[in-house]
């Protein structure tokens, strides 16, 4: 039980941490004020409408 539980927590962290990082990066690009550096390089990828 402990081995599978540890594997579950490890996989959860392995998936969750990059997801939270990407969500934070996505929100910062949505605001546009904090990340003017990312907005220019990622306009074509994240903002195809503009």
UniProtKB/Swiss-Prot annotation:
User: Topology versus the membrane, per the UniProt entry?
Assistant: Single-pass membrane protein
Could you tell me where this protein is found in the cell? Cellular thylakoid membrane
Pfam short name (any one): PsbM
Name any Gene Ontology BP term.
photosynthesis, light reaction
| Record keyword Transmembrane helix present | yes
Residue ranges that the Swiss-Prot or TrEMBL entry lists as coiled coil: none
Q: Name one GO cellular component term.
A: plasma membrane-derived thylakoid membrane
Q: Which UniProt keywords apply?
A: Membrane, Photosynthesis, Photosystem II, Reaction center, Thylakoid, Transmembrane, Transmembrane helix
TM ranges: 6-26
Keyword Membrane on this protein? yes
UniProt xrefs under HAMAP family: PSII_PsbM (MF_00438)
How does this protein assemble? PSII is composed of 1 copy each of membrane proteins PsbA, PsbB, PsbC, PsbD, PsbE, PsbF, PsbH, PsbI, PsbJ, PsbK, PsbL, PsbM, PsbT, PsbX, PsbY, Psb30/Ycf12, peripheral proteins PsbO, CyanoQ (PsbQ), PsbU, PsbV and a large number of cofactors. It forms dimeric complexes.
Family from the record = Belongs to the PsbM family.
Q: What does this gene product do?
A: One of the components of the core complex of photosystem II (PSII). PSII is a light-driven water:plastoquinone oxidoreductase that uses light energy to abstract electrons from H(2)O, generating O(2) and a proton gradient subsequently used for ATP formation. It consists of a core antenna complex that captures photons, and an electron transfer chain that converts photonic excitation into a charge separation. This subunit is found at the monomer-monomer interface.
The protein, known as: Photosystem II reaction center protein M
Give the species.
Answer: Prochlorococcus marinus (strain MIT 9215)
